[in-house]
Regions:
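Cleaved targeting-peptide boundary
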Residues: 10-17
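Extracellular repeat-rich scaffold modules on cell surfaces
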Residues: 23-114, 145-206, 215-306, 317, ...
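Generic detector of short, aliphatic-rich beta-strand segments that form the cores of beta-sheets
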Residues: 107, 142-143, 211, 323, ...
């Protein structure tokens, strides 16, 4: 039976009695239903023109599809299909709501079947049916449908919820002012090639099913809400078309409190600890998409957890995937990135690339073994760390596409798990700071930034060299550079307090304070810089040529200064340029004589000698003018980059520091780095 409209109407028409009686209702304007407490199942339908408001304290279940529209005078929205051969739909100036669910009331579409939706579908939209009947939800809207459906434009502050395991599909198209909570128990398509989705005011989504983000061609979609999960098995799938990007700025967390309306986690540490029956296991599948975690304004990582609580799959679909980390502070990825199926993420390597964006403060730690076949790019200004107190980390390097492009800073700080890296390029810095050994292997190690060993061992193997590295620094006594059988060829600078295991050939700048366990050869274009302690060579031959630089030795030298402590048995061969055995050297107003047979018979030692008045004009102090070549030892700080890169650069461009000797008008030599006599 269909109820007849009244002859006159003052305010909204109340059809509660008709609904409770199961009668069909024809709308002729604004209409209300007051639902009593408990559950009311309505087997009738709504039709006509008007609006429907559901209020009260109970639940109204619709079992049949209803079709009505707003009065023509209130229709204003414009629906456009654009994109040519790749069509997508946009809605501008949306109509006011045709359905309103007031606070305290619950409207349920369907009862576990395929019918029960309110909607009008006049648009010939591609691949989905756009609903003209927009809805405002300040109470609760429950979607108990197995079919595919669309709700038009959604507003309000309430709860929209799906029961679990129905596997209906909600096509959530367009931009929605809704600011409440979405409880996805089944499947939400938040974007497709045919539409983009924007939810700028949504605070939280409780994801207990599959939440899929997709885009039309050439569109950037941002999801700024936090996602929560309560049960094992939920995931977020991300897809995108060529030229598109999906930006996720919130966090995907477990929830142990707050129910459906305000999910939250009592302790963030619970994301990193397996719960009973793994109910806090959640994941994301990136399917040939360009995905960015963060937008440079937050330091909450999207997927907090370990391999036991989260999974991350980087997959190829139409194209390889790209995952960018863009944060403004330190974040830790405690789980591996793989390419398996759902929870079995390590069944196959990931198919995509990873970027650490060059946002100021972006400092990302990988605290797990990564397993993706692709490039890892650290942009200028960014930091990527492998390993932390939460666990050791590494990059998989066995795939054909595996490589590291480092224009920022790459830090390896594993406690116990060795790391091997090959194909490392870029202009950025490399830092070894963990107890476990890091190995650079192969001829693909070509980066040009500074190499710093703070702790543990950095090893070079299979043809890897540091000839392009701007500076090599061993900043602690426990720092160790293992150069293997090939030895280390220094073409830039080598400084610090640590040990080089293997032979060193100096064609650049080497500073005292280091220990070399193999031989030490300094060629004609090399320079040895005297520091507070001598260069120690504990094994192998010592062959000298090139320059000795005393400008960093201080202004109050001892009467006897050891420049090179040759702890081997063989004689020191060769001599510094212009400093044959017994030659005089003046610095800090003191004349010293050099010997290559000092100490235990083969050390290079400077011994103070009495200054003769006639010789005084010939000895200019080496620490005179404040040029790079005459900096004191206190200015060469191991905690920073040091000043030797600038020394080397100045040398390459302008004759290398201060000339070893210069002639006066009378043709006599005066001291530069050193003044030699004999």
């Amino acid at each position: 039976m269909v109820t007849a409209p009244p002859a006159t109407a003052a305010g909204p028409r109340d059809v509660t009695a008709d609904v409770l009686g199961g009668r069909d209702v024809t709308l002729t304007g604004d209409t209300v239903v007051t639902v009593p407490s408990g559950t009311t199942t309505y087997d009738g339908v709504f039709r006509g023109e008007g609006t429907l408001t559901v209020r009260g304290s109970g639940t109204l279940i619709l079992t049949k599809d209803s079709d009505f529209t707003l009065p023509e005078s209130r229709r204003r929205q414009k629906v456009t299909t654009q994109g040519g051969n790749h069509p997508y739909v946009t809605t501008t100036n949306p109509d006011p709501p045709a359905i309103t669910v007031e606070r305290g009331a619950t409207l349920q579409y369907g009862n576990g079947g395929t019918t029960g939706l309110i909607g009008h579908f006049p648009y010939n939209t591609p691949a989905f049916r756009l609903n003209q009947d927009n809805i405002r939800v300040d109470g609760t809207l429950r979607l108990s449908l197995k079919s595919a459906y669309n709700l038009g434009t959604i507003s309000g502050t309430g709860l929209i919820t799906q029961p679990r395991f129905l596997w209906g599909t909600w096509d959530l198209s367009g931009t929605h002012p809704f600011s409440g909570v979405i409880d996805n128990g089944t499947q939400v398509n938040a974007g497709r090639p045919e539409f983009a989705t924007s939810l700028p005011n949504v605070r939280k989504i409780l994801n207990q099913g599959t939440y899929t983000v997709d885009t039309p061609l050439g569109r950037t979609v941002t999801m700024g809400m936090d996602f929560y999960q309560r049960e094992y098995g939920s995931d977020i799938n991300v897809q995108s078309r060529p030229g598109s990007k999906v930006v996720l700025t919130g966090q995907y967390s477990w929830s142990d409190q707050g129910g459906d309306t305000d999910p939250s986690l009592s302790d963030p540490a619970l994301n990193w600890t397996p719960a009973r029956k793994n109910i806090n296991k959640r994941g994301t599948n990136i399917k040939g998409a360009n995905v960015q975690w963060g937008d440079g304004t937050t330091n909450k990582i999207f997927m907090p957890g370990t391999a036991e609580t989260v999974y991350i799959n980087l997959l190829a679909a139409r194209s390889r995937s790209l995952l960018t980390f863009d944060y403004n502070g330190p974040v830790t990825l405690g789980a591996p990135i793989g390419g398996g199926r759902f929870h079995d993420t390590l069944a196959a390597p990931g198919a995509g690339d990873v970027v650490i964006a060059g946002t100021r403060g972006n400092d990302v730690t990988f605290a797990a073994k990564q397993y993706y076949d692709g490039s890892t790019t650290v942009e200028k200004g960014a930091v990527l760390r492998l390993g932390s107190a939460q666990g050791d980390g590494s990059l998989w390097m066995d795939g054909d596409l595996c490589r590291v492009v480092n224009d920022g800073t790459l830090v390896v700080r594993n406690a116990s798990t060795p790391v091997s890296l090959s194909r490392v390029s870029g202009s950025g810095a490399f830092v070894q700071s963990g107890a476990a050994t890091t190995t650079l292997a192969g001829s693909g190690v070509t980066y040009t930034g500074t190499t710093t060993v703070r702790k543990g061992t950095l090893a070079l193997r299979s043809g890897a060299t540091l000839t392009r590295s701007r500076e090599i620094r061993l900043t602690s006594a426990g720092a160790r550079l293992d150069v293997g059988a090939s030895g280390l060829r220094v073409t830039t600078t080598l400084t610090g307090k640590g040990t080089v295991k293997g032979a060193v050939t100096n064609e650049g700048v080497v500073a005292g304070g280091l220990t070399v366990t193999g031989g030490f050869t300094q060629r004609a274009d090399g320079r040895l810089v005297l520091r507070d302690t001598p260069l120690k060579v504990s094994g192998g031959a010592v062959r000298l040529a090139g320059d000795l630089d005393l400008s960093a030795a201080g202004n109050d030298p001892d009467r006897e200064i050891t420049v090179l402590d040759n702890q081997g048995r063989g004689a020191t061969k060769g001599a510094f340029k212009g400093l044959r055995e017994g030659a005089e050297v003046k610095f800090a107003d003191t004349v010293h004589r050099i010997t290559y047979r000092g100490g235990d018979g083969n050390d290079v030692v400077l011994t103070a000698a009495a200054e003769s008045p006639s010789a005084s004009p010939a000895h200019a102090p080496a620490s005179g003018a404040p040029t790079p070549g005459t900096r004191s030892a206190s200015t060469a700080d191991d905690s920073g980059l040091g000043w030797w890169p600038y020394v080397l650069a100045a040398g390459l461009l302008g004759g290398l520091l201060i000339p070893a000797t210069r002639r006066t008008r009378r043709g006599r030599r005066r001291g530069g780095r050193h003044a030699a006599h004999g």
